[in-house]
A protein has these predicted regions:
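Function-determining sites in protein domains
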Residues: 19-155
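C-terminal motif of bacterial Sec signal peptides marking the signal peptidase cleavage site
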Residues: 14-17
């Protein structure tokens, strides 16, 4: 009996040490892709679709931006950016198959202003009901990001 328990204990220890490690490159490839559709606020014309991940991340990373409590009602919208992200890969789905995108945020820029309004899509937060005004944020967009955005539009 002691031999069986000892063998099971050794077997269990061996199994816990034999964990499969995914290479870092493969993990990075499996990240969800994002894209931005950039529209004119005046006529809702699609100006550009941005799917370069570095550019998307740069335009949407608001972590270092100045948070503003509110913005003036006098500001006129200039551009509307719709940010999309690939839907989560579900069990049984082929990882090589193209996935649909879901809207995660709407960002509105304003004429002659560095202020933006970010509206987080309520579909991003699953299984919770959050008031709509809790999903709206205002920021002052840094000058370099603003310049990058205008360069993308002028291309």
């Amino acid at each position: 009996m002691q031999k069986i328990i000892g063998a099971l204990l050794i077997f269990a220890l061996l199994l816990t040490g034999c964990r499969y490690n995914t290479p870092r490159e493969k993990q990075e490839d499996e990240k969800k892709h994002s894209k931005i559709e950039l529209y004119s606020a005046q006529d809702d014309e699609l100006l550009q679709t941005i799917d370069n991940q570095d550019t998307v991340n740069k335009l949407l990373n608001t972590s270092d931006w100045e948070v503003i409590e509110s913005i003036s009602d006098d500001l006129k919208p200039e551009y509307i950016m719709l940010a999309y992200q690939e839907k989560t890969l579900l069990y049984g789905q082929d990882p090589n198959e193209a996935r649909d995108y879901e809207l995660i945020a709407t960002v509105i820029t304003y004429q002659n202003s560095s202020y933006i309004k970010e509206i987080i899509s309520s579909t991003v937060i699953k299984n919770m009901i959050i008031p709509e005004n809790a999903l709206i944020f205002y920021y002052a967009m840094p000058d370099d990001i603003q310049e990058d955005l205008h360069e993308l539009i002028d291309e």
